Amino acid sequence: MDTPVYLYTDGACKGNPGAGGWGVLMRYGSREKELFGGEAQTTNNRMELTAVIEGLKSLKRRCTVIICTDSQYVKNGMENWIHGWKRNGWKTAAKQPVKNDDLWQELDALVGQHQVSWTWVKGHAGHAENERADDLANRGAAQFS
């Protein structure tokens, strides 16, 4: 079996909306890489999605990926809600446009290129890798605040 790539992702926002950042700690075996960035005007959910997108975009080949996020929004969106959104033309069950549909569609396309599983971790609870992703996201936000 392939050694999986772990992506520990997080988003941060100073105000919601406001300056925001995203962070990714990538781990493949004993190797690690850190990624982060931000935007001047965004939301926490957009940064959570962007973190996963940027992590997946950095992969150079198809692989097994375990995405560890503290965002129920991202995890539930990809595991539960997205199927209905796609079936309904990117509308919610209430027939409203899906928020952040641009990012959801990009994430959906990227996930399709890999063997992906999702793990939820409790945020701000001492999970070392999640704390590092949070620090990276805050560094990304600090560039714009």
Curated annotation (Swiss-Prot):
Cellular compartment(s): Cytoplasm
SUPFAM superfamilies (UniProt xref): Ribonuclease H-like
Positions annotated to bind Mg(2+) 1: D10, E48, D70
Domain (RNase H type-1): residue spans on this chain: 1-142
Presence of the UniProt keyword Secreted in the record: no
Pfam families: RNase_H
GO MF: magnesium ion binding; nucleic acid binding; RNA-DNA hybrid ribonuclease activity
Reactions catalysed: Endonucleolytic cleavage to 5'-phosphomonoester
Keyword Hydrolase: yes
Record: residues binding Mg(2+) 2: D10, D134
Enzyme class: hydrolase
SUBUNIT field: Monomer.
Family according to the record: Belongs to the RNase H family.
Protein name: Ribonuclease H
Organism field: Neisseria gonorrhoeae (strain ATCC 700825 / FA 1090)
